[in-house]
Amino acid sequence: MAKKIVGYIKLQIPAGGANPAPPVGPALGQKGVNIMEFCKQFNAKTQPQAGMIIPVVITVFSDKSFTFVTKTPPASILLIKEAKLQKGSSEPNRNKVGKVTKEQVRKIAELKMPDLNANTVEAAERMVEGTARSMGITIEG
């Protein structure tokens, strides 16, 4: 018989940087999950992506065991990295803070493809371009 699912926990944690402090500890503690075990597994799995923020969906079962699935980093984080910025614009309509090329947008779209509900890379590119516009980043090319 399959284990009964108690709940899902969605978090965004820096790769290789999960620790029992908030937000990880309280979120997992409420469901009775072994926090240190999750931290060890997550850090081991995300070590190669150090410096990125990784969304993770943790499935908690009735016997307090868990599984987790890591997603690709948010498009906004990838855009900031490509444009070599600290953060997006506070007024995206007025001040533009950076530029990315069509090739960079395509690279991000291809990386994000498994997590987006887009059927084609072109549709994924348009989603990434929309994120860039809302952050005050212009697309060249």
UniProtKB/Swiss-Prot annotation:
Single Gene Ontology BP annotation: translation
Annotated protein name in UniProt: Large ribosomal subunit protein uL11
UniProt function note: Forms part of the ribosomal stalk which helps the ribosome interact with GTP-bound translation factors.
Gene3D superfamilies: Ribosomal protein L11, C-terminal domain, Ribosomal protein L11/L12, N-terminal domain
Keywords: Methylation, Ribonucleoprotein, Ribosomal protein, RNA-binding, rRNA-binding
Coiled-coil region(s): none
Gene of this entry: rplK
Gene Ontology cellular component terms for the protein in this record: cytosolic large ribosomal subunit
GO molecular function: large ribosomal subunit rRNA binding; structural constituent of ribosome
Domain of life according to the entry: Bacteria
NCBIfam families named in the record: L11_bact
PANTHER family, alphabetized: 60S RIBOSOMAL PROTEIN L12, LARGE RIBOSOMAL SUBUNIT PROTEIN UL11M
Binding partners and assembly: Part of the ribosomal stalk of the 50S ribosomal subunit. Interacts with L10 and the large rRNA to form the base of the stalk. L10 forms an elongated spine to which L12 dimers bind in a sequential fashion forming a multimeric L10(L12)X complex.
Family, per entry: Belongs to the universal ribosomal protein uL11 family.
PTM comment, free text: One or more lysine residues are methylated.
